[in-house]
UniProtKB/Swiss-Prot annotation:
The active site is at 651 (proton acceptor). The keyword Membrane does not apply. The lineage of its organism: Eukaryota, Fungi, Dikarya, Ascomycota, Saccharomycotina. It comes from Candida glabrata (strain ATCC 2001 / BCRC 20586 / JCM 3761 / NBRC 0622 / NRRL Y-65 / CBS 138). InterPro entries: Kinase-like_dom_sf, Prot_kinase_dom, Ser/Thr_kinase_AS. This is Serine/threonine-protein kinase HAL5. ATP binds at residues 483-491, 520. The gene is HAL5.
């Protein structure tokens, strides 16, 4: 390891295909053997450069507002408990810099060249965090727990009278406290009731901590039963699970390891009838925040109701969660609302006449898959209900590939073979300008599937679906409309009837009658080189496809260490399939046209959501802080998953964040992603060159000739995206001091005052949570990347640990 400590990590081309070329040369440092000596595997999160021999240390930030003077040199993320002993009142409104560019204006121009489970909501405290994080390093035990909503937050209109009375009563009657359900205290107005109030005694807090440990130990976190006040006071049960919900999870999911997504967190008792339908009782809780598309209840649970595009609205009400819709089961329904959302992150809107013209003049129903038969591993169900993939057979004729040293990498030997296969087929298809559809003519082509049941209507595919040739219209249905266009083509929505042979989890959005898919039609530009187009299409598809399917833990384990079992945490990393990555399903071709089949997210993207909020009465187009926190946690989870598997997105922005109606966030558009570590590499490869969309690009990217860690530019972009959600505006247009006055102001304030006025003016529903959030933002916006906080540490921060998210992740951070 000596060489890695004296030289900076090597940089590589952003192109996946270019990176693969020469990967296994004699002089390549990516080989797992250097000078005949084997080296230990280094995880993707470990920096080999001497600059990163030590872990990131959070920079101490002076947050003068609301902080005792003697502690102003300490950051709440690393400060002693006295830092948080006092809290000031929260202002009732946000003070924004009117000089910033509004998000409702024209979008940022790109500067690049080219679970299913059942209803649940993640706890305020992340799973297993006691083993990894000692909260006493952030605040003192005597002040553990956050205050309830401030009286001065008039916009939320929440009275604390009943909560205070209940708190006083709890301090007098200890027996009453023991009988109380700690997750749902008898309060009519508490948002952060899980954490309690500072006025509550330590016994209550210990009780809450013990219950939190129970909740994190389960494989499927379930929505606890909501009882009336009398029932809660008279009950001795401390369980936070509903037996009916837990039993249903195993029936619906068919995969005990899959993540649990909460289509709706309505705090009502839910029972499952004999026919599989959900029956809700009248024991509902009070809704304390009730906006058009976002609701928060007094127990802290929340739900999203994002409108869907008209194209997917049929005769039946859309399901909030496509994964839970199958024969005999139903998701919770929402009222249908009109929406003008589109996939603006990939394609821009086009007028209706041109869209219809494109729809009529570019048929692709006879397109056939370019995916080879062995490109997909058949999935099968184990005895415990988990889904695993059958390992691929090794081709003896293929060039010898070095031993895998990084089992977490998304790009491995199978992806390498797939790159070669697809590149050859794309080039052949482009050269054959006058050729017809290749359905039936390509011996290596075959349909593909990510689940055990066939998706084609032909009954002959029921047993050997992956050996038959199926056209696009048979597999994914007929086009029902165009939702946008871009430089390289158009995107359509296709739908087909939901068949009895279809089983959850479905590969894309589904209502109770149809499956919907997003079809991205790609054509080379007139002046584009064939090699360049082939590389672009192949790289984008391979990265998205490899991230959106479960990795083969058993096969990789045998390659890395046949005689030993992987550690439990490492095994979960291999098995985990992130719900926040857009599924890339198939790549097809017909008549010099290439078709990328993707999961449809019918609620549009974050940019459209912000614009719609601005148009519906919200002057700045911002989101509620609790709503923004939920989306931020999902974004960080998705980015963490990408980084764990050796890929950095490099172009995170609102346009590339799509939604399902239930608020499930999906990261899309991997065309500019960087593969910084493959399965054969021990080292993290740095990157150089400008890439991304200007308002979201980190400052080190603009330093020409210097290499940078692509993971840290993703972290910076996440911070910009969050600020866009809470401010409704860009922080600045470009992070170059002499080109943008707003960024120059940020640099000046941080140097002179060690704080930024906009961050100091941010407000939340809870004063202590606001401080924790503010200090994480300061560490995300470190202009020196070596001092910048990582995505992993953000997820381990107290802000994220105490952020409710509508996705419950079985995989711990």
């Amino acid at each position: 390891m000596g060489e890695s400590n004296t030289a900076a990590p090597p940089s590589r081309s952003r192109s996946l295909s270019a990176s693969i070329k020469g990967l296994f040369g004699k002089n390549s440092i990516s080989s797992n053997e250097i000078n005949g000596k084997k080296e230990a595997f280094v995880q993707s999160g470990t920096r080999e450069d001497q600059r990163y021999n030590e872990e990131h240390h959070l920079k101490k930030i002076d947050t003068k507002a609301s902080v005792p003077k003697k502690d102003t040199q300490l950051s709440p993320l690393s400060a002693p408990g006295s830092y948080l002993k006092k809290s000031t009142s929260i202002a009732s409104s946000l003070h924004l810099n009117s000089g910033k560019q509004s998000v409702t204006s024209s979008r940022a121009q790109s500067i690049s060249s080219d679970g299913n489970g059942f209803l649940s909501q993640e706890s305020f405290i992340s799973e297993e965090h006691e083993d990894d994080i000692d909260d006493t390093t952030y605040y003192d035990k005597s002040t553990r727990g956050f205050t309830n909503l401030s009286k001065e937050v008039e916009s939320y209109s929440i009275s604390r009278k009943n909560s205070i009375q209940q708190s006083r009563k709890a301090s007098v009657d200890d027996n009453e406290v023991d009988k109380r359900n700690a997750h749902f205290p008898d309060s009519d107005t508490t948002i952060d009731s899980v954490l309690g109030d500072k006025n509550k005694n330590q016994k209550v807090m210990n009780q809450i901590n013990s219950i939190s440990n129970i909740s994190r130990s389960g494989s499927v976190p379930a929505n606890p039963p909501i009882l009336s006040s009398k029932s809660r006071r008279g009950s001795n049960a401390m369980s936070i699970r509903s037996p009916s919900v837990r039993s249903t999870a195993s029936i619906v999911s068919g995969n005990s390891n899959s993540e649990v997504i909460t289509p709706s967190s309505k705090p009502a008792t839910q029972n499952i009838s004999e026919d599989g339908n959900i029956k809700k009782t009248d024991n509902t809780l009070k809704c304390v925040i009730n906006s058009k598309h976002f609701k928060v209840y007094e127990n802290g649970f929340h739900e999203h109701h994002l409108p869907v595009i008209d194209l997917v609205k049929g005769d039946s009400t859309d399901s909030l969660n496509s994964s839970t819709v199958s024969k005999g089961t139903e998701g919770i329904e929402i009222n249908r609302q009109k929406s003008s959302f589109s996939l603006t992150g990939i394609f821009k809107k086009k007028n209706g006449d041109k869209m219809n013209e494109l729809l009529d003049t570019e048929p692709f129903g006879n397109a056939s898959s370019l995916m080879p038969t062995k490109a997909f591993c058949p999935r099968y169900k184990t005895k415990d209900g988990s889904m695993i993939e059958e390992p691929l057979e090794q081709e003896t004729t293929h060039k010898k590939i070095p031993k895998i040293v990084n089992p977490y990498a998304a790009v491995g030997s199978e992806e390498l073979k797939l790159i070669t296969t697809l590149s050859d087929k794309i080039k052949k298809g482009l050269k054959n300008k006058d050729g017809q559809s290749r359905s039936g003519s390509q011996s290596g082509s075959a349909s593909s599937s990510l689940h055990t049941s066939p998706v084609a209507s032909s009954t002959s595919l029921s047993s050997k679906f992956h050996h038959a040739l199926v056209t696009c219209s048979e597999k994914y249905g007929d086009p029902v409309g165009v939702i946008g266009h871009g430089t390289y083509g158009v995107v359509r929505v296709c739908s087909r009837p939901l068949l009895i042979s279809d089983s959850a989890p479905f590969p894309s959005y589904c209502n109770d009658k149809k499956l919907f898919f997003a079809i991205k039609v790609l054509k080379p530009k007139d002046d584009e080189q064939l090699e360049k187009f082939s590389t672009r299409v192949t790289s984008e598809f391979i990265i998205g496809h490899s991230l959106s399917r479960r990795h083969k833990a058993h096969a990789l384990q045998n390659k890395v260490c046949p005689s030993k079992r992987l550690a439990h945490k490492a095994q979960r990393k291999l098995d985990w399939e992130c719900p926040n990555i857009l599924r890339v399903i198939d790549l097809m071709e017909t008549n010099n046209t290439f078709i990328e089949v993707m999961e449809l997210c019918p609620a549009g993207d974050l940019h459209s959501l912000l614009v719609s909020r601005s148009q519906s009465g919200n002057a700045i187009g911002s989101l509620h802080p609790l709503e923004a926190d939920c989306f931020m946690k999902q974004l960080l989870r998705g980015v963490q998953y990408m980084h764990d598997h050796g890929i950095a997105h490099c172009d995170l922005k609102p346009e590339n964040l799509l939604f399902h109606p239930n608020g499930l966030l999906k990261i899309c558009d991997f065309g500019t992603s960087s593969v910084f570590q493959t399965a054969w590499e021990k080292h993290v490869h740095f990157q150089n060159g400008v890439i991304g969309s200007e308002p979201y690009v980190a400052p080190e990217v603009f330093q020409l000739g210097k290499d940078y860690d692509p993971r840290l530019i993703d972290c910076w972009s996440c911070g910009i995206v969050y600020c866009t959600m809470v401010f409704g505006q860009y922080l600045w247009k470009i992070a170059i001091e002499n080109k943008d006055s707003l960024y120059a102001s940020f640099i000046s304030q941080m140097k002179d005052e060690n704080q930024f006025s906009l961050f100091e003016e941010l407000r939340h529903v809870n004063a202590d949570l606001n401080k924790l959030r503010k200090n994480v933002l300061y560490n995300m916006f470190q202009t020196n990347p070596e001092k910048r906080i990582t995505v992993d540490k953000i997820l381990h921060s107290s802000w994220m640990k105490h952020t409710r998210c509508c996705v419950s992740y079985n995989h711990s951070v």
